Curated annotation (Swiss-Prot):
Cytoplasm in keyword set: no
Annotated function: Initiates apoptosis in a BH3-independent mechanism possibly by recruiting ced-3 to mitochondria and other cytoplasmic membranes. Has a role in lifespan and tumor growth.
Biased segments, Polar residues type: 49-65
Gene Ontology MF terms in the entry: protease binding; protein homodimerization activity
Protein name: BNIP3 homolog
Native species: Caenorhabditis briggsae
GO process annotations (BP): apoptotic process; determination of adult lifespan; mitochondrial outer membrane permeabilization; positive regulation of apoptotic process; regulation of cell cycle; regulation of programmed cell death
Keywords recorded for this protein, A-Z: Apoptosis, Membrane, Mitochondrion, Transmembrane, Transmembrane helix, Ubl conjugation
GO cellular component: mitochondrial membrane; mitochondrial outer membrane; nucleus
Quaternary state and interactors: Homodimer; via transmembrane domain. Interacts with ced-3 and ced-9.
Length: 220
């Protein structure tokens, strides 16, 4: 029995030695491989202080705290990005306001095809309810009366035509010119007629008054 126990212990000890030797050989081979590989260059990332001069480390004022970077002033890139975003938002709002339908007198949004419909809507809202507005619509939608391009005017018995781009003629050009002198035929004729009429009326009134006076004296 003792011989068997010794053999078992010897086998265990030999197995442990072989395990240690194999592990040590594996470690040596891995170290050799690492030594054979070239060292990769270390990548250095730019610090916040190098990118922005307005950033100061917190460790300078508080040495007890861990090193951290604080941005005292916004950088130009952040300002430009915020300005660009604001401009885009303003442009979108302007575009929406331009594309929005026409609203009249706080009414719901309704799109009108032409200005005539807008005019008709305004007229109907301004007038009191219960009145017919068809005549107003006909009056507002009718074409404007434009004068003819050529105007014929009578001057001294002749027909003259104005050129198309000439200014409008005055009223004095439509009628022939006549002098208003005292010895004009119309003036003399009117003067004689009025004098004769006034003479006849005066004679009739005088005759009636004289007749009444004579009758009054005869009675007394």
């Amino acid at each position: 029995m003792l011989d068997i126990k010794k053999k078992i212990n010897f086998a265990n000890v030999s197995g442990e030695k072989t395990d240690e030797s194999s592990s040590s050989s594996a470690q040596q081979s891995s170290e050799q491989q690492q030594a054979a590989q070239p060292l990769a260059p270390q990548q250095t990332t730019p610090t916040a202080k190098a990118t922005n001069p307005f950033i100061t480390p917190m460790t300078e004022s508080t040495p007890g705290m861990s090193e951290s970077w604080v941005e005292l002033a916004p950088s130009r890139t952040s300002l430009c990005s915020s300005v660009d975003i604001n401009m885009v938002i303003i442009d979108e709002k302007d575009k929406d306001s331009r594309l929005s339908p026409v609203s009249i007198a706080q009414s719901p949004h309704v799109e009108f095809e032409s200005l005539e419909q807008v005019k008709y809507k305004l007229v109907r809202e301004m007038l009191p309810p219960g009145k017919n507005t068809d005549w107003m619509w006909d009056w507002s939608s009718r074409p404007e009366n434009t004068p003819p391009k050529t105007i014929r005017m009578v001057q001294y018995g002749s027909n003259l035509t104005t050129p198309p781009n000439s200014p409008e003629p005055e009223m004095s050009q439509y009628m022939p010119y006549e002098s208003d002198s005292l010895f004009n035929v119309r003036v003399v004729f009117g003067f004689l007629v009025t004098n004769i009429f006034s003479f006849v009326v005066g004679a009739a009134v005088g005759f009636a008054v004289c007749r009444k006076i004579i009758k009054h004296h005869r009675h007394y």
